[in-house]
Amino acid sequence: IEGISFNAAERGQFNFFFFFGLNDATRYREVVEGIEANNFTFGSIGLSTNYLQSATNYAQGWKVGVAGTNRNYKGAARATYSSGLMENGWAFTAQLAWRYTPYIDIKGQIGEGIAYNSFGYFLTAEKQWGKDKRLSLITFGAPTRRGQSAAVTQETYDLTNQYNKTSWGHNNYNPYWGYQDGKVRNSRIVETYDPTVIASFDWQINEDNFLKAGVGYHYSMYSNSALTFYN
């Protein structure tokens, strides 16, 4: 992101849940294949991607969207605003995004037993001095809470249908959910939040030399619940 690597230290991979719902914020990027020459990385097996998030990369104006589906996401809304480069040398871009589904407590329905609630935010500010220097400050995050579904074998589908004589034997069966004290509960709740802050400085020294420096802070939070049973 802006030339700074945010691959996970444990696995070396990039976690795309940083950006849940922030489609407009991640619209502009550079992609290179393998060890192809580029200006942001040494390359690697597969693809390398650099997200460009300075405020002046975004088209000036408003963008608002609302969506509804009958699948895992029941509703979504997002709004994006970009000021463009102003006379004082500043530019700002911001996006808010929200995706939601309540608990699906109808057996046989796609996504039964799951719930989803995600709020994403993105803000970038850029200051330019002349045509050769610019400083960008960027922050984003997407706190998310979601219920999971299980990978189930065909044998499980067949058995639930045989012994319960209900619609449980369909291919949407999810054993992770049920009722507790009369309320729907999913035993496998995942909560994620990865707030990130970036400062990036670009300086076109002359026609042949360009300086890019950046520093970033990233905090990762991931939790996953489960239930156990005692006699």
What are these regions (language model features)?
Residues 41-43, 69-73, 113-117, 180-181, ...:
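Short sequence motifs at beta-strands and strand-loop junctions characteristic
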Residues 11-14, 31-33, 61-65, 104-108, ...:
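Extracytoplasmic loops and strand-loop junctions of Gram-negative outer membrane beta-barrel proteins
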Residues 44-46, 74-76, 118-120, 192-196, ...:
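Transmembrane beta-barrel architecture of outer-membrane proteins
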Residues 4-33:
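Short acidic/polar hinge/loop motifs at secondary-structure boundaries
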Residues 7, 35-39, 101:
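Short beta-strands and strand-coil junctions in structured, solvent-facing domains, enriched
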